[in-house]
Amino acid sequence: MILVLDFGSQYTQLIARRLRESGIYAEIVPFFESVENIQKKAPKGLILSGGPASVYAKDAYKPSEKIFDLNLPILGICYGMQYLVDFFGGVVAYANEQEFGKAILEIVQNSVIFEGVKIKSLVWMSHMDKVIELPKGFTTLAKSPNSPYCAIESDKIFGLQFHPEVIQSEEGGKILENFALLVCGCEKTWGMQHFAQREIVRLKEKIANAKVLCAVSGGVDSTVVATLLHRAIKDNLIAVFVDHGLLRKNEKEKVQAMFKDLQIPLNTIDAKEVFLSKLKGVSEPELKRKIIGETFIEVFEKEAKKHHLKGKIEFLAQGTLYPDVIESVSVKGPSKVIKTHHNVGGLPEWMDFKLIEPLRELFKDEVRLLGKELGVSQDFLMRHPFPGPGLAIRILGEINENKIKRLQEADAIFIEELKKANLYDKVWQAFCVLLNVNSVGVMGDNRTYENAICLRAVNASDGMTASFSFLEHSFLEKVSNRITNEVNGINRVVYDITSKPPGTIEWE
């Protein structure tokens, strides 16, 4: 196992992900993790991440100096390398010629860390400081046009000024793999088959004969959680799916069919009337979210009580992922709010369940791989993200059944055409928004005054930033024609070409 010490870089999670993609298990801890805790984890090597600070600043992030007493191989990346240089007596200073973006790395000295790596390759830089003078005992391994010391080595200690974890670094994955396998002696033992087998055994031991309540949204995380739990505890899993009437077209039926194929009993609650009655007359986005969250808890509580009376429920399953765990112990200290799974936060006191989080070690892409390992269909696993409040935040203004139906039909056409054109898997997320404006149109010889639909499609890697998708005009024309001809009450279709930032992906 490789342990990554986080100094606050936006790329830290990518380090662990790249290693895991190579079959090497990696964990992330804050830079101030105690040496005692590091020893308990028994890593075979340490990686010091990048970070936004300068090593010569008064408040610079610095780990315990005792990490060097562990006699472990260490790789410093960007700030991590500069910390190593500063600690061992070298000089780091503000760079007059800073490097951001792509640069050419040229290897000038053979090293095990560059085994099988091209002499010249593209790398990703992001630094304002640079190494001016190496400490005694360090050797230069590589350079870039503006960094004479772009990679350095001293015995089992290595430094890289660039970011090998970023996909733009052509040989970055190979370099990280070399450090883990050839320097640290790790083995490729990490994978979802191994994880599934281990986790099923662990869940059986932890839960025994107790009952577990799991809220299912129809999304990837909750479906994989339910599938994993069912493999472990069979019918002691109580999976609850709340239909709030704000789902995509045929969503309920698709979720039910999926769980039937997986042979997992699913308790479906039709709460459409309850939700829509409480949302009547509400147009403010945050109030919509609040009402949906509170109503979900009421409905979920009522259903939980029924099962609680039949046999005490001891556990509540949540789809916490590894990024949530990292966030809670970030370099800035514990977060004030830990994200909970779907709408399960704020449950009443009587529901004093123990939490069980089977996915807390996994990244999102690993959850999909685990789902595939467990037999969840690929089509289901690769579906686009869908917000917890559902179509409520894609209908601008007040919500009613007619608006929901219009949006469901338009959205289904858009998604269907994306799949026909083999575009669905090429965009990160696509959906329709029902605008709260009417516009004048002409159909036949008649004047119309009807709703407008907005098409939204974006490309992204994680949703933190996004750019609108460049869809062909002929494709957009086809979708527009179908929607205006097939969906009653729609006479205009527009395409959103806003990126994030300045806009958000969802409209509300």
From Swiss-Prot:
Keywords: ATP-binding, Glutamine amidotransferase, GMP biosynthesis, Ligase, Nucleotide-binding, Purine biosynthesis
InterPro entries: Class_I_gatase-like (IPR029062), GATASE (IPR017926), GMP_synth_C (IPR001674), GMP_synth_GATase (IPR004739), GMP_synthase (IPR022955), GMPS_ATP_PPase_dom (IPR025777), NAD/GMP_synthase (IPR022310), Rossmann-like_a/b/a_fold (IPR014729)
Keyword Nucleotide-binding: yes
Reactions performed catalytically: XMP + L-glutamine + ATP + H2O = GMP + L-glutamate + AMP + diphosphate + 2 H(+)
Pfam families: GATase, GMP_synt_C, NAD_synthase
The organism's place on the tree of life at top rank: Bacteria
Domain Glutamine amidotransferase type-1: start-end pairs: 1-189
A GO molecular-function annotation: ATP binding
Domain GMPS ATP-PPase: 190-383
Enzyme Commission code: 6.3.5.2
Ligand binding (ATP): 217-223
Active site: 78 (nucleophile), 163, 165
Recorded metabolic or biological pathway in which this protein acts: Purine metabolism; GMP biosynthesis; GMP from XMP (L-Gln route): step 1/1
Keyword Nucleotide-binding on entry: yes
Gene Ontology cellular component annotations, sorted alphabetically: cytosol
PANTHER family linked: GMP SYNTHASE [GLUTAMINE-HYDROLYZING] (PTHR11922:SF2), GMP SYNTHASE-RELATED (PTHR11922)
Function: Catalyzes the synthesis of GMP from XMP.
Assembly, per entry: Homodimer.
NCBIfam families the record matches: guaA_Cterm, guaA_Nterm, PRK00074.1
Protein name: GMP synthase [glutamine-hydrolyzing]
Organism: Helicobacter pylori (strain J99 / ATCC 700824)
Gene name linked to the record: guaA
